[in-house]
Regions:
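Fe-S-dependent hydro-lyases/dehydratases of central metabolism
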Residues: 1-686
Length: 686
């Protein structure tokens, strides 16, 4: 085992001595190591472990060890992630290329089964489910069946790959969202294994084929989203080239006040970091406020790193990390390994620690966070809930001005023609009477036509999910209902969410307001919101209405959520439920009533908003380790639709397919490699 730097050391965990490349030992040679940001310490260990004198040299290690926080990035280094995560939309091409490489290997007379990922690769199928059915008890089953019909060949290919390739696993459809499954189950935090026959440990690091891979930063794991070529290189054990980055420190103090959520916090942070400008930079959170921030909140923040503009948004490992690992069913041996390694490696955070040195520092007192939304077109455009109505009306006026001027011009022209035309007399721009499901109602500009509890950004967080359920319960007790034009949906990022909603019996209240589970996948967050009811969509088109959506997602660009929905607002799950009840954006939820109870008394948001203490009590009583253990004990097996697929076996993909995404399994690009043996990468990526 190479140790040219003289930094090999040992620590004890689970009753045995385990080797590691020691940052404290390197600090004896480079004093600056002690004050490096935690994220750069992880990168530095990576360089030390893969230092080979050629691809990665002692000079590379020294350059990072002596990091200048104010220097513009110029020094290129190689980062070798420990594993790769993929989703089905961007991950399929990588597996197609592996299949094509096997074809090429076979054509050259080699052993096709030698082509395998060298680094662990795990693909979660979550990007294909759409909300075709909603608002009914069988919506989940119906959407699942439609999903399999639409993706039959792709899914058969991935199921074949699951059995054909070593070091490659597939989480089947209808299981969860990649980043939430990664957080709750796949992540190791600290890897252990043998290097040259000796027990060793090293940090869990990764790249993923999805920009929100950074959700795992909340667990203290360094990783981010990359393109397909980089992901394939990482799967084959190759390093990724990068410049030593600048690191922005984000200091958190205090506690979140009553009535606010992690969603409000992350929208505040998004606005601050967008104004700062952090493209190409790491963001690292520190400060005593971390001790009051549950890991689920940290994951929500890490998830939105792409919206910040940063490469990653990481939290250090600390007691909260261990608490979450225990809750989510990790073994006692894993917990001891993580803590022992992090402490030995100076990767463990305490409030008493001296702060690392950063390129620049932003500060936020959590007590200053207030209820917020973001929209209507960008996640960084935060709107205070108290100002949401006026802000919306101002933005709506800008959007409808041209339409209304053109309509008025047409009306004036028709009015001068005579003949009793009704255009000028009856038609109101941006409004129409609609009949749907035996109800007739006026649909107009500002109507909320989609209300979606969606995205791992928020569905990974029990506080906001149970908060939504409590609000639904309170609203139901007051006799409030969702407006008939609102398409409601609930798409959890893992089945654990369903388990604790059922245990708490809050699923009944959400379903009573139309929030039935429609799938375990990305759905509305990535634009798979499905069709609107035909009468509603036709009215929006014909009358050029400015329709709205409210979702607990992470992006809200115009047209992303639905082609006919122009204004999209990001909000916490409880606010999604509240706006579904209101049915419109031109409402002041702070001062205007949501509706009336059966006796005609006004009901305000404050009357149904969940109490923070009650949310915590629900978490303590209903979110259990046993739920995680049960759901993830068979996470790679899939349901009957997956198990019953007609899938080929063997080392080669043998199906002739018409699917464009699978056509390149016999790609001609592989044929010019020439005769002779194909060079194989070595285990250490050389």
């Amino acid at each position: 085992m190479r140790d040219e730097l003289g930094c090999l050391d040992h620590f004890k965990a689970n009753g045995k001595e385990i080797g590691f490349y020691s940052l404290p030992k390197l600090a004896e040679q480079h004093e600056n190591v002690k004050r490096l940001p935690y994220s750069l310490r992880i990168l530095l260990e990576n360089l030390m472990r893969f230092e080979d004198g050629s691809n990665i040299t002692a000079d590379d290690v020294a350059a990072l060890a002596n990091w200048d926080p104010e220097a513009e990035p110029s020094k290129e280094i190689s980062f070798t992630p420990a594993r790769v995560v993929l989703q089905d939309f961007t991950g399929v091409p990588a597996i197609v290329d592996l299949a094509a490489m096997r074809e090429a290997m076979k054509a050259l007379g080699g052993k096709a089964d030698r082509i395998n990922p060298l680094s662990p690769a795990e693909l979660v199928i979550d990007h294909s489910v759409q909300v075709d059915s909603y608002g009914q008890a069988d919506s989940l089953d119906l959407n699942n069946q439609i999903e399999f019909k639409r993706n039959k060949e792709r899914y058969a290919f991935l199921r074949w790959g699951q059995g054909a390739f070593d070091n490659f696993k597939v989480v089947p459809p209808n299981t969860g969202i990649v980043h939430q499954v990664n957080l709750e189950h796949l992540s190791r935090v600290i890897f252990d294994g043998e290097i040259d026959g000796k027990p060793m440990a090293w940090p869990d690091t990764l790249v993923g084929t999805d920009s929100h891979t950074t959700m795992i930063n909340g667990l203290g794991i360094l990783g981010w989203g990359v393109g397909g070529i980089e992901a394939e290189a990482a799967m084959l054990g190759q390093p990724i080239s990068m410049l030593i980055p600048q690191v922005i420190g984000f200091k958190l103090t205090g506690k979140l006040p009553e009535g606010t959520t992690a969603t409000d916090l992350v929208l505040t942070i998004t606005q601050m970091l967008r104004e700062k400008g952090v493209v190409g930079k790491f963001v690292e959170f520190f400060g005593e406020g971390l001790s009051h921030l549950p890991l689920a909140d940290r994951a929500t923040i890490g998830n939105m790193s792409p919206e910040f503009g940063s490469t990653c948004a990481i939290f250090p490992i600390d007691d909260e990390t261990i608490r979450y690992l225990k809750l989510s069913g990790r073994s006692e041996e894993r917990l001891e390994l993580v803590k022992a390694y992090a402490e030995a490696q100076d990767l463990w955070r305490n409030d008493e620690d001296v702060d690392p040195v950063y390129t620049d520092v932003l500060e936020l007192d959590l007590g200053d966070v207030v209820p917020s939304l973001a929209g209507p077109k960008r996640p960084q455009d935060r709107v205070l809930l108290s100002e949401a109505k006026n802000t919306f009306l101002h933005q709506l006026s800008d959007m409808t001005k041209k339409r209304d001027n053109e309509r008025n011009s047409d009306m004036d022209r028709f009015a001068g023609e005579g003949g009793g035309t009704a255009v000028g007399a009856t038609e109101v721009p941006g409004a129409a009477e609609v009949t749907y499901k035996d109800q007739t109602f006026l649909l107009k500009d500002g109507a909320v036509v989609i209300a979606a509890i969606t995205s791992c950004t928020n569905t990974s967080n029990p506080a906001v999910m149970l908060g939504a359920g409590i609000l639904a319960r309170n609203a139901r007790e007051k006799g409030l209902t969702v407006k008939p034009w609102v398409k409601t949906s609930l798409a959890p990022g893992s089945k654990v969410v369903t388990d604790y909603l059922k245990k708490s019996k809050l699923d009944d209240d959400l379903e009573a307001l139309g929030f039935y589970t429609v799938g375990y996948g990305c759905t509305t967050c990535i634009g798979n919101s499905g069709p609107l009811p035909e009468p509603i969509e036709e009215a929006i088109k014909e009358h050029e209405m400015v329709a709205c959506s409210v979702l607990s997602g992470n992006r809200n660009f115009e047209g992303r959520i639905h082609p006919e929905v122009k204004m999209n607002y990001l909000a916490s799950p409880p606010l999604v439920v509240a706006y579904a009840i209101a049915g419109r954006m031109d409402i002041d939820l702070v001062n205007d009533p949501l509706g009336e109870d059966p006796d005609g008394n006004p009901v305000y948001l404050k009357d149904v908003w969940p109490d923070a203490r009650e949310i915590q009590d629900f978490i303590q009583s209903n979110v259990t380790t046993e739920m995680f253990s049960k759901e993830y004990s068979h996470v790679f097996e899939g349901d009957e639709l997956w198990k019953s697929m007609d899938t080929p076996t063997g080392e080669m993909w043998s199906v002739v397919t018409e699917s464009p995404s699978l056509a390149s399994t016999r790609a001609p690009v592989m044929s010019p490699m020439g005769s002779g043996s194909m060079p194989m990468p070595s285990k250490n990526g050389g």
